[in-house]
Amino acid sequence: IVIGACGQIGTELVLALRTQKGNDLVVAADLHDDCPSKLLGGPYAKMDILNREAVRSFIINEGIKEVYLLAALLSATAEKNPAFAWELNMEGLFTILDLAKDGHIEKIFWPSSIAVFGPTTPKVKTPQLTIMEPSTVYGISKQAGERWCEYYFNNYGVDVRSIRYPGLISYT
């Protein structure tokens, strides 16, 4: 399942996964009804990542084993509503991490962002382990998410994978 499937990355990821795994095996899920029509070639679920019980029921009942969690409030919008950004970005992640901890999900893919860095991070040849002082709500939530993913891996063996995306420019 790709949660947050209607966004820029989600749309392309769903199409690539359906090509690789088959249309019927990849569920596109999002809160919005106005997803790109190209996602209609396979299963679609209207899903609010903040509805913990609905997400849990869907994943367990459908036997979903891999989750790509892309649902998030991005930088500009997050700055306007920090409390909601934190809730959306963290509670959604906790829901999925807990499902994996409980044995319902085998793999989680959760993107982080270059936003975890800040003005004090070296700009050239940035090492993997370096100063991270994010200066945005989005960056703060992504940095916290990285730590939570690490915690769930170290303490519960949760298979969670992440990359830090650079700044992406919308294609629309």
Predicted regions and their residues:
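A hydrophobic alpha-helix adjacent to the NAD(P)-binding/active-site core of NAD(P)-dependent oxidoreductases
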Residues: Y44, A85-W86, A100, I108
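Conserved glycine-rich Rossmann-like NAD(P)H-binding loop of the short-chain dehydrogenase/reductase
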Residues: G22-C35
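NAD(P)H-binding glycine-rich loop region in Rossmannoid oxidoreductase-like domains
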Residues: I49-L88
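Conserved Rossmann-fold NAD(P)-dependent oxidoreductase catalytic core, especially the SDR/UDP-sugar
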Residues: F94-V137
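N-terminal Rossmann NAD(P)H-binding glycine-rich loop of SDR-like oxidoreductase domains
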Residues: I1-Q20
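Conserved beta-loop-beta element that borders a ligand/cofactor-binding pocket
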Residues: S113, E146-Y171
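Active-site helix of classical SDR
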Residues: V137, S141-A144
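Rossmann-fold cofactor-recognition segment
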Residues: L40-N51
